[in-house]
């Protein structure tokens, strides 16, 4: 238990991680309808978006990378929903396997885009991934 309770913790993150989080929050703003949940989503989105606007100079390259990241995260959202439906129906056949593989490949692409954002912005923090080759 924290003795000094804080309502938020400030942590430095890479620019790619910030873009990723904001893109996911934008998707949540569109997908989630529960008003109480939406309030928390909007509050977090506004806080993070303000940091992005205040700390980064917008340009076409970064905007394109953000859009690509959001597109990947949107696809992941749909695939995760479909995979949960397979789980609910105990359907672990070809569709489930394809969805699982799609998540794997999209997450690799997502990591690549985040690294490119970090490189483009000179982010001092970079998320480094290493996986078994396939």
Predicted regions, residues:
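Anionic, Ser/Thr-rich low-complexity intrinsically disordered regions
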Residues: 6-134
């Amino acid at each position: 238990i924290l003795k000094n309770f804080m309502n938020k913790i400030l942590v430095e993150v890479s620019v790619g991680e910030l873009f990723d989080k904001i893109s996911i929050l934008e998707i949540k703003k569109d997908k989630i309808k529960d008003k109480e949940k939406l309030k928390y989503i909007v509050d977090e989105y506004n806080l993070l978006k303000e940091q992005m606007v205040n700390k980064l100079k917008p340009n076409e390259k970064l905007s394109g990378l953000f859009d690509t990241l959001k597109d990947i995260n949107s696809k992941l959202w749909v695939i995760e929903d479909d995979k949960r439906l397979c789980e609910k129906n105990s359907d672990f056949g070809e569709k489930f396997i394809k969805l699982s593989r799609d998540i794997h490949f999209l997450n690799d692409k997502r990591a690549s885009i985040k690294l490119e954002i970090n490189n483009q912005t000179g982010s001092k923090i970079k998320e480094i991934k290493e996986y078994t080759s396939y």
